[in-house]
Design a protein with these regions (language model features):
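ATP-binding glycine-rich loop module of kinase domains
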Residues: 38, 43-69
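Short beta-strand micro-motifs within the conserved protein kinase catalytic domain, predominantly
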Residues: 87-100
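Activation segment signature within eukaryotic-like protein kinase domains
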Residues: 133-134
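Conserved catalytic-loop aspartate of Hanks-type protein kinases
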Residues: 205
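C-terminal lobe substrate-recognition/regulatory segment of protein kinase catalytic domains
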Residues: 246-295
Length: 380
């Protein structure tokens, strides 16, 4: 992207119609008009921008978040050519150095909007298509998990779907090495362990995938979302959210007793989950939760294993991909590469205290990697 295009984005971004906004960032579809004198809905690939193509621009206020921002850009650069992840095209700082702009290839609507479109227009969606989506998400997660990385925010809004049914995982703002994250994600997609403040793991990604799996067939997002007041932050309400989850979606009982309709979720049960002492009680997903059109017995068993309260029993990514349910899709699996090296990670994030001082230098190096240079792996 040339300087004129970058300047146009900075000048006009705040006047655009954003499709997503929070206190930290804004997202917009942008396009240059034919003479590149203003912005509308804009686009391009590989840094060469053309009319009638679209890209997404993510504006982030830095405001001390140097580490989080740099990690997101770093992992996007590592996955730039990966089949299962959204492609980053460019990144640049605002003139005052207070904001950063991440330019991403527009891969299509997110999964939530995609399903809503079909429901609104009374269009039929193949149940096999849902399974194909889950399989592709699993393939993307395998790329991360094989490198001991976790996405940590898998949900409908972070999966985009192309017109041909290919998916791309997006929003790597919480992606990191295992043991580097303690709390990340979205209400309704957080595992019990995350809600209780434990370090994040691959099993937490699998939980989130289980939620997406169930919600796809129910054609409704946010099924497990706990109602919170506007002033309540999810990270401060872990006990409340977990209690809501257990009371509404699980049957809980003492060992060797009968299942009963009304759960009595006590501190003892939640503390047992926190300590991993699952022999103190028995549990199951409420059977009626899985009574969904198109969900066969194999689907139900996989969802049960993905949403197992015990992370040690939760289905892992390899078992999911190799399960009998997804055998017919295995030929579609593309072992798409990730240009990630532990040495690169340690260079940038090994000493987090240096990030702010070296931010511009590190950003420039990663930008060169995005633009196709081999700075990271150049040993000369």
């Amino acid at each position: 992207m040339n300087q004129q295009q970058q300047q146009l984005i900075q000048n006009e971004f705040d006047q655009l119609r954003w499709y997503y906004k929070n206190d930290f960032e804004k997202w917009a579809y942008i396009s240059f008009n034919e003479n590149q004198g203003s912005l509308a809905f804009f686009g391009g690939t590989g840094g060469n921008y053309h009319l009638n193509t679209t890209v997404i621009v993510k504006q982030i206020r830095i405001n001390g978040n140097h580490l989080k921002i740099l990690k997101e850009i770093f992992f996007l650069s590592c996955l730039k050519k990966n089949r299962y992840f959204v492609e980053i095209l460019d990144v640049f700082l605002s003139n005052d150095g207070q904001k950063i702009y991440i330019v991403l290839k527009d891969e299509g609507p997110n999964l939530k909007d995609y399903i809503n479109f079909y429901i609104k227009n009374d269009k039929l969606v193949s149940f096999d298509f849902f399974r194909h989506i889950i399989f592709q998400i699993a393939c993307g997660l395998k790329i991360l998990h094989d490198k001991n990385l976790i996405h940590s925010d898998i949900k409908h809004g972070n999966i985009v779907v192309s017109g041909t049914g290919l998916i791309k995982i997006c929003d790597l703002g919480n992606t990191d090495k295992i043991s580097k994250l303690k709390y990340a994600g979205t209400n309704g997609y957080l595992s019990p362990q995350v809600l209780l403040g434990k370090e994040m793991s691959k099993e937490d990604d699998m939980w989130s995938l289980g939620v997406v799996y169930l919600e796809l067939f129910k054609k409704k997002a946010g099924i497990f979302s706990c109602p919170l007041d506007k002033k309540e932050k999810i990270k401060d309400c872990g006990f409340k959210v977990l209690k809501y989850l257990l009371e509404n979606f699980y049957d809980i009982k003492k060992p060797n007793s009968n299942w009963y309709e009304e759960n009595i979720i006590t501190n003892v049960i939640i503390n047992s989950i926190k300590s991993g002492e699952f022999n103190m009680f028995e549990y199951r997903l409420k059977p009626n939760l899985l009574e969904v059109e198109g969900l066969n017995d194999d689907d139900k068993e996989i969802i049960k294993k993905l949403l197992d309260l015990n992370p040690d029993k939760r289905m892992n990514i390899n078992d999911l991909i190799n399960s009998s349910m997804f055998q017919e899709y295995n030929y579609m699996f593309i072992n798409s590469d990730i240009n990630y090296r532990e040495a690169d990670y340690e260079r940038y994030f090994g000493n987090e205290n240096t990030i702010e001082n070296n931010f511009n230098q590190f950003l420039n190096e990663i930008k060169q990697k995005i633009n196709g240079l081999t700075l990271f792996n150049n040993n000369n």
